[in-house]
Amino acid sequence: MPLLTRIRGPRDLDRLSLEQLDQLAEEIRTFLVDAVSKTGGHLGPNLGVVELTIALHRVFDSPKDRVLFDTGHQSYVHKLLTGRQDFSKLKMKGGLSGYPSQAESEHDVIENSHASTVLGWADGLAKANQVLERDDHVVAVIGDGALTGGMAWEALNNIAAAKDRPLVIVVNDNERSYAPTIGGLANHLATLRTTDGYERFLARGKDLLERTPVVGRPLYETLHGAKKGLKDFIAPQGMFEDLGLKYVGPIDGHDIEALESALARAKRFGGPVIVHCLTEKGRGYQPALQDEADRFHAVGKIHPDTGLPIASSGADWTSVFGEEMVKLGQERKDIVAITAAMLQPVGLDKFAKVFPKRVYDVGIAEQHAAVSAAGLATGGLHPVFAVYATFLNRAFDQVLMDVALHKCGVTFVLDRAGVTGTDGASHNGMWDMSILQVVPGLRLAAPRDADQVRAQLREAVDVDDAPTVVRFSKGAVGPAVPAVGRIGGMDVLREPGTDAPDVLLVSVGALAPMCLEIAGLLDKQGISATVVDPRWVKPVDEAMAPLAERHRVVVTVEDNSRVGGVGSAIAQALRDAGVDVPLRDFGIPPRFLDHASRGEVMAEIGLTAPDIARQVTGLVSKLDGRFERPTAEIDSVEPARD
């Protein structure tokens, strides 16, 4: 009988010998490869934390002790050890979340997936324990790039100030972007001490620093300069101990016995302590180890034996953007690219291969990325910062006060905009158009197809006196949606076929095919509709108000929150223009959406063609009892421009 099937909770681990624990670790890796290959998910990070998670649950008593995972995609093993072994519907409707979930288990403290936050959570929980005189332990697991985020270092600065507050910080150093990216290293480390045992750490520590991405070699050289006249090296605990934090390590993150010993020492310490664990991302799975780019950080459905993806049909939005960026880079030397530790996921890997000196990976530091982009623009370049829509939320102040206030020509490309589905509440890009509506001067484009991604990206980078945003969906991009004409700066996708149309249907971004379907359904009900794509949804096109005035009702359809979104902006523009036409906005309701497929989520919130057509039909029926049709004709439609 496999050992894994006997684990129903953390305390079941207590009965296993070290030999059995090693066997369990291998069973877990086999399980993860088999399960995640069928559903997709974060495979590489979890293969790297198997022994570490086992040791954590043997040393600490969850849920009494709080074990928190930063970038919660590292929590699959934690789920398995806390009684959740049905991965058949991972990230699917009714199945396990891809991140910690309070609804799933009392062992999940926070539902986090945005990086670098766990130390702040842990600081607050530890303070609460101290005030309420509880003897519970708080353990924060951070790594897999999360220490490149400034928020983590803000928390460390506060944590280090309380020497008597118990808090265990486990640093999962998997060689993949573990790099505390901070400035002024020479000054910060000026008081580095040398230890009596530094000779034992010389070779190992130098290797640790030199293999640390981004800052490793410069850090070593800085230390060498800062300690000129003394020894040329310092043991790796220096950067943490100089902050006032006790340090244990480095520990082999795949040696359960060594891990348990180190964690037990940290548990007894009585103050904040760092346990530094060296792990291997993708451990035990050869295809992941051979993937130098990201060690199978996140995968779709794959063949478990080879790791090759199960083919998907058609191009995706991200690759269309990435290919156009290469073309722009070849045409314009001032085009540079920025990513926040997401080079491949946002499609900038091809640009980086062609222009390695014109791409900047700043780590998980969206705030810094936005301000650095402002500096690049002020210096005469045009930066394109590609980021998931949900992660731009973290840099709003910088977009507002550094980029927009200074009228910097920066282009933000928002990938995974709208409903993303399987990654759940934290990854839906459903707030960007609402948040960005308030930014003065900012221009926002929502392309409807691949051709428009290319065209509107080019339009965006031609703007040098204001921030521009291009946002698009996740996954495969559908067929081209041709325009039949243009009114102002808006593409007309369908003409009404009558001089007195009922509905002006405003389609935003990738929802163009849905809006054309809605128009077809309305037509069957005897309701005529004009379908337009504004292309640039901020600012509202000047032609919108006179066009709306020639219809009986305006309907907006957007893959964004209804609160403060495109519909709200158009309603305000109509009011400002004195146009008194009813407007009905359809979008995402103001609530967090659970994980499921995109189609299932859209159906759940009523954002489908049949649902919208039914409601619009009802609205027009009500108007028929109260108003007469206007007789004004629509202006002639100009031919579509290429």
From Swiss-Prot:
For this chain, one GO molecular function annotation is: thiamine pyrophosphate binding
Which GO terms fall under biological process for this protein?
1-deoxy-D-xylulose 5-phosphate biosynthetic process; isopentenyl diphosphate biosynthetic process, methylerythritol 4-phosphate pathway; terpenoid biosynthetic process; thiamine biosynthetic process
Biological pathway:
Metabolic intermediate biosynthesis; 1-deoxy-D-xylulose 5-phosphate biosynthesis; 1-deoxy-D-xylulose 5-phosphate from D-glyceraldehyde 3-phosphate and pyruvate: step 1/1
Look up the record and name the cofactor or cofactors this protein needs.
Answer: Mg(2+); thiamine diphosphate
Q: Which residues bind thiamine diphosphate?
A: H73, S113, H114, A115, G145, A146, N174, Y285, E366
Reactions it catalyzes: D-glyceraldehyde 3-phosphate + pyruvate + H(+) = 1-deoxy-D-xylulose 5-phosphate + CO2
For binding Mg(2+), which residues are annotated in this chain's numbering? D144, N174
The UniProt keywords, alphabetically, are: Isoprene biosynthesis, Magnesium, Metal-binding, Thiamine biosynthesis, Thiamine pyrophosphate, Transferase
Q: What sort of enzyme, by top EC class, is this?
A: transferase
Domain of life of the organism in this record? Bacteria
* Cofactor binding comment, as recorded: Binds 1 Mg(2+) ion per subunit.
One Pfam family per UniProt? DXP_synthase_N
Alphabetical GO CC annotations of the entry are: cytosol
Q: What is its EC number?
A: 2.2.1.7
> Which HAMAP family does this one have?
DXP_synth
Role description: Catalyzes the acyloin condensation reaction between C atoms 2 and 3 of pyruvate and glyceraldehyde 3-phosphate to yield 1-deoxy-D-xylulose-5-phosphate (DXP).
The record's subunit annotation is: Homodimer.
The entry's protein name is 1-deoxy-D-xylulose-5-phosphate synthase 2
Q: Which gene encodes it?
A: dxs2
